[in-house]
Curated annotation (Swiss-Prot):
Chain's gene name: fogD
Database matches in PROSITE patterns: ADH_SHORT (PS00061)
Keywords: NADP, Oxidoreductase
GO biological process: phosphatidic acid biosynthetic process; secondary metabolite biosynthetic process; triglyceride catabolic process
Disruption phenotype: Impairs the production of flavoglaucin and congeners, and leads to very low accumulation of the carboxylic acid (8E,10E,12E)-3,5,7-trihydroxytetradeca-8,10,12-trienoic acid.
Origin species: Aspergillus ruber (strain CBS 135680)
Enzyme active site: 147 (proton acceptor), 151 (lowers pka of active site tyr)
Protein name from the UniProt record: Short-chain dehydrogenase fogD
Any Pfam family the entry gives: adh_short
GO cellular component assignments: endoplasmic reticulum; lipid droplet
Coiled-coil residue spans: none
Binding site for NADP(+): 8, 34, 55, 147, 151, 180, 182
Length: 286
């Protein structure tokens, strides 16, 4: 039986990628992880997992990885998992567009670049492409408009990619991830609303939001076990929903009116307090 190979991007310590690559290795698949060039990789070395440096926003970096993977696998790749991603938390009206461009470069153009350069290896193996999406790409979760936009873009691109790759017997799975216990928000913990923001009455709410530990999350290794199992099926789900809150959100998205989220998030994010503060300020200015 020939060796199977799985390549997972974004395998830094504490994230979904690390959990996914660990699960592929546990199943006897030759797991190939990537980490940022300056990112620690001791956790992968200790686990005996093959790893290479990769910056998905850099064309030369992707081409260097391709050459290494081709040499290792003989030009075939059974599974490509596009997991590398970053977050940016801010209100839509206070968004730093340059920061959002960086996020799109990683979350959207990164997977596009990987598929562009690795598709021939995947076709030769009649393999699978797994794109890690999010419930944020489905619902208007507050303070996440830009991140949500990257995931919505990824998910729609992945949806079309699935149809386009079908003639080559390549399976494309879009994973709609619920809340999973990872450290993706660690770089946002310092973020605060800009001075003078219309959202300033909720400044403390925002601070608590970016420093929060979500109360109900799915263990990342449990998540990985289910996602990997799905990716290895001969007929996987087109959209695979998994993780905390994903079942509820899937139901509401399918069967409820489009604005069902408005009232839910109005209460969850205390928007009534913001409306009162804005109305009071407007009256004083009259």
């Amino acid at each position: 039986m020939s060796t199977k190979f799985a390549l997972v991007t974004g395998c830094g310590q504490g994230g979904i990628g690390e959990a996914l690559i660990t699960e592929y290795a546990r199943r006897g698949i030759h797991a190939i992880a990537t980490v940022l060039p300056a990112e620690p990789s001791d956790h992968l070395a200790r686990a005996g997992i093959t790893f290479f440096p990769l910056d998905v926003t850099n064309e030369e970096s992707v081409l260097e990885l391709k050459a290494r993977v081709q040499k290792l696998t003989g030009g075939r790749l059974d599974v490509l998992v596009n997991c590398a991603g970053i977050a940016y938390t801010m209100t839509a009206i206070d968004t730093d567009v340059a920061a959002v461009q960086r996020m799109f470069n990683v979350n959207v153009f990164g997977p596009m670049r990987m598929v562009h350069h690795f598709h021939d290896m995947i076709i030769k193996a009649t393999g699978a492409i797994v794109n890690i999406g999010s419930i944020g790409g489905v619902v208007p979760y507050l303070y996440g408009s830009s991140y949500n936009a990257t995931k919505a873009a990824l998910q729609h691109w992945s949806n079309t990619l699935r149809v386009e790759m079908a003639p080559f017997d390549v399976r494309v799975i879009t994973v709609i991830s619920g809340e999973v216990a990872t450290n993706i928000l660690k770089n946002d913990a310092h973020r605060r609303l800009p001075e003078g923001s219309y959202y300033s009455p909720l400044a403390e709410n925002f601070r608590q939001h970016v420093t929060r530990t979500p109360p109900r999350t799915t263990d990342r290794f449990q998540y990985a076990a289910n996602v990997v199992a799905e990716s290895l099926r001969s007929s996987p789900s087109a959209w695979f929903w998994y993780g905390s809150q994903s079942t509820l959100i899937r139901f509401l998205d399918m069967f409820c009116w489009r604005t069902v989220w408005d009232s839910l998030f109005w209460r969850m994010f205390d928007l009534g307090k913001l409306k009162e503060a804005h109305s009071s300020k407007a009256k004083k200015q009259v």
